[in-house]
Amino acid sequence: MEMSQRRFKVGDRIRIIRMDGEPEYSGREGVIEHISTAYEPAGILEQLHGTWGGLAVQPSMDTIEIIQQGE
């Protein structure tokens, strides 16, 4: 994903609908504090880090929704 194609921004409030392999994260909400890039064999993955817990969300693999856009 190119930087200009990002849908998510620092400050956005999201809800995790489904996190791959982590059912206890379903329904959690939080604010995106940092966005990073992971270089995996499958390609470049965007990772969202925030106030919902210790794990990063990967929008290409996990199901999330923006519930409030940051300013």
Where are these regions (language model features)?
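Short, conserved secondary-structure segments in the cores of folded domains
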Residues: 4-7
